[in-house]
Amino acid sequence: MSIFSDISNITSKKRKLEVPKPKTNLFVRGIVLFAFGLLGASVYTIEDIDKTPALIFLCIGAALIIAGIISLICYGKQVTAFKKYTPTWEKHRSIFDDFAIELNHWYDSDMRPRSCDGDTSYILRLQKDRMARKGIRMIQHTSPVKRETMGTTRVPRKTSWYTVDLMYEGVDRHLQFQNSTGTIYERVTEDTMYETVVHTPNEQELTRMSMTCPNCGAVSPVAALTEGCPYCRTVFRISDLFPRVTNIFFIRENASTKNQKKMGKTTGITMLVFFLACFIPSFLDRESPIPQALLMSFFVALIMGGIFGYIISIIIFMTKQFNRDGRKRIPFWSYVTTKGKVKSAFAPYDPYFSFEKFEGQIISLIRMAIMSDHPENLASYCGGTLNPYFQDIIEMTYMQAMTVQNIHMEGSHLCMTLRTWWINYSEKDGSINRRGDCIDVTLRRNTAYMEPPGFSITSAYCRNCGASFDSVRQRNCPYCGTVYHMENEGFIIERLELV
């Protein structure tokens, strides 16, 4: 399922590594020099050759072996330096970096992020509150991935209201869970971090565009906030209100450096096995000259060992990918056709529909419902009692795998059931369990209404009296008592089921 909607709009800001990646050609050169040196030195073992040429071959071979060892030592030093190096986010490089820094501070020192909206802050608070009740503390630290990449990629989408950017970059994510006894779980993964950023509002639409006041949380037109919030009187500039991160999520990176290293090790081990299997019998057979045995063994190891090693590593990798953590419950064909099915369903009703934004919204709704101790109070959740297992989940990582189970219309209401794939961390009796889960979610949305810009579940806008209130904690407007129907503003969850 591609994350891109329009390849021509994609831009990237490359990130420079202060400590360069180890040079692979240095390693290859060391191996080649060592192999040729060993081959040259082995000529000295041939009894039928004159001693003078034999000594020359021995000296040349020794020199090549020394040169190869020096190259391998230099490569080893580069590997050591690169292992010790950790890339860092750059403040004010972009809002992507700024929010990444704020997110790290949120987990290690409880400093509230300033670059995100109220809904994103609310989900982070839900997660932290649940862990606090369980006596768990999570330390999450992200840093730019330690390899050559495109850097921060931006996919912009301009609407009549503002511009929405989907920004993402590969990150090294260090997760650590602690309780009163110390660290009880630790894991380092390579993920892709996604941020949805709203910026550059259309000034002609400021009176119709609602936004949560960064100071008091009330919903007001953006134009009113620039003149002074009607509730707290704080005056904001447009630069104070935008840009704003409206969604954040992580997706596990399957083609990670760790997997590449495993494939390389598998290939290397297979080549070594082929080399030893060919050389040892030839060496024991005194009739075969050692140079001939070495040359034949090198050839077999390089060709046969390399090919078989690569095939074996691919088979192991693919088997793990399609069978691990519940992945087998996501049929491949359904997976690759999901984006087209969802876009086709929304095409007649929403000309501004973006699958990337939709995917991010669904991820947030699921996380909010599962992280909430009282999901029945959420205006976005209208289902029954959730699986008790959900109450133990303390961290969720979406695996960028979603399939359509059902799509149909009920009057003007679009109803769909999706299957989503997650890696969840749960706490039970003081221990952390990591497992893959497939979660089916049934959604409903009234297509007769367009989703308003700046829509926030934590600060909803009453269509009857115009007041703003927190729809997370109550379904009725506290001022006029009108029932709030969130399906007229966005999606609601009707069912959430663990598969």
Task: Annotate each PLM feature.
Residues 15-22, 75-79, 174-267, 317-333, ...:
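Short beta-strand edge/turn micro-motifs at domain boundaries
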Residues 50-57, 289-294:
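Short, aromatic-rich membrane-interface segments at the entry and exit
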Residues 77, 81, 102-105, 242-358, ...:
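Long, charge-rich boundary regions
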Residues 112-208, 367-368, 372-460, 469-476, ...:
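Structured, amphipathic secondary-structure segments that form assembly/contact surfaces
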